[in-house]
């Protein structure tokens, strides 16, 4: 079982690196820029993106919006939406994309908000099941979203969210950018 998990992690990591390389190529060739807003993933997506040489030509930066204060006061998420739906909802990640694009002056943004788990006694997101993570990619009038709802433990939930976000971004760019020399 341990060897199987190691292989699975290796495959996931390699898959993410290859996708990041393709993202790099698409953004660089199309002279587009990217920013990130990460809550539960805490910078993992930015780390994957910046691990590719040349990412400084298109990646402007990222915001770790772990607290609702950062979501509302810096990235402009409507506090009423968080109060009504929690920070783990589609509307919040869409607003994070818009706020990130405005703040960082980017063409595209990736945003993630979720509850990776496990639940604790002082947890304010307990209304949301562990493993519930929303991802959004896009620009103000063209945002795609993805909801993850599988709890495999905190570490795997975060790794899965990072991988899914990278692939959602790659699919989005492939549909909207001029083709590059990618697989």
Please name every model-derived segment.
Residues 2-183:
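Short alpha-helical segments enriched in small residues
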